[in-house]
Amino acid sequence: METLNLPAGYRLERGLLWPADDRDCAALVFDTVPDMDHALKHCRQFELAVQAGGNMGVWALSLAAKFDRVVTFEPDPKNFRALVHNTSTAKNILSLPCALGNEAGTWCDLEREAGNAGAHQVTMGDIAPIVTLDGLNLPALDLLYLDIEGFEMMAILGALETIVRFKPVIAIEDKGLSDRYGYSQGQAEKFLATHGYEVVARPHRDVVMVCR
């Protein structure tokens, strides 16, 4: 049998390239893909979805089966290499090595939790650029799906013009990690409520909101 030559520091996880040192992330990622259905059933159109963090591409690949186009963001260089490899045959996925935030033009470092390729804390540095969704001038936005370890509020602030314009379905992870950045748990939800959004589902630690 032919042996697949993997890049150093990677393994295969359910057929996808994956960081070899990850212990905790893989099972959680695959187990939570069905949670997307709570958001998808509220989408009226399926032209464009934005998803962050991209991780190794599992969520982006799932969304690519539904949407015409998917834009995914992953600032961790090791994860991004796997993401690009795993999504290379999906021509409707655009992968960007950036963090979504509210201050375009700044750069960040990523403090990675040992054994968990999906757990990061953003600090100022020089590993990856921070961009705003508003700065991309997207032609549409039907779903905004954010799982970025407490950085969701900053991403929303940097996407507010786009959100107001297109009124996408929004799904965010909210497990209290926003405290790291000066925002309390539930603050992003309350902020979106002031712009006409209401909660329609709470799968696990996520909050799904739609604009009425």
Predicted features and spans:
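S-adenosyl-L-methionine
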Residues: M1-T89, L177, Q185-F191, V199-R212
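Glycine-rich adenosyl-binding loop in Rossmann-like folds that engage adenosine-containing cofactors
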Residues: A8, L12-D37, K91-P139
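Short internal loop-to-helix segment that lines adenine-nucleotide cofactor pockets
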Residues: A27-V50, N116-F166, S178-G182
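Hydrophobic pocket-lining residues within nucleotide cofactor-binding pockets
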Residues: G54, C98-N102, I148, D174
